[in-house]
Amino acid sequence: MRTVLVVIFLLFYALISLPMFLVGFILGKIDPHKKPRFSQPFVIWGFRMILRISGVKLTVKGKENILRGQSALYVFNHRSYFDILAGYVTAPVPTAFVSKKEIGKLPMISRWMKYMNCLFLDRDDMKQGMRTILQGIELLKDGTSIYIAPEGTRNSGEELLPFHEASFKLADKSKRPVIPVALNNTDEVFEKHLPWIHSAHIIIEYCEPIYMDQMERAEKKHIGETVRAILAEKVAENAKES
């Protein structure tokens, strides 16, 4: 039943998105900064509705570590499409996600993502990947936070996959803090029950900021391992509360 209700809501959301796209387009012509600030609250509302219909109980820990008025690189462990929903409904405005290029081909979703300055990464094209990193650095400098999963893909295993160190260039070059974000049980909603949606208790924890500009060069070299260890510890701790 939850699955049917989510599908019905998505159809409704797609319908009302049409005039909202036009509003966002016009605002973007007036001021490019207004487009993401208009779009993200509408997307957050949609995500909140999906979480509610899905029967998700969302526990947010470490709210004091969510930076308001300053951009940051939010680094999360990736287990499910619902990571994005849990992330966006708790993230500051404006925030953009780094996603694989295939998502950019989905009609309605890709339009909203582009309106929010989300980045599409082609993992098979190094030049395009570098351009994406440079775009992300400029977004961070301009005040837009970025959510990224350094594992590079969804992980269904017990242990976190190795982190791609290049992801952290976004924070290093923009001189913005890294905030590890630990997610638990997001795959309990959908991926573990395909094609059905089940209720679940999602825990998202924002960890203390890490300032790379205060680190030694040797520490920066292994920042991915450091953040991975922090997230692995938090995921293990929060698993006991699930």
Regions found by a protein language model. Name each.
Residues 48, 85, 168-169:
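Active-site phosphate/pyrophosphate- and oxyanion-stabilizing loops and adjacent acidic/basic residues
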Residues 61, 98-100, 122-123, 150, ...:
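Thr-Gly-centered strand-to-loop micro-motif
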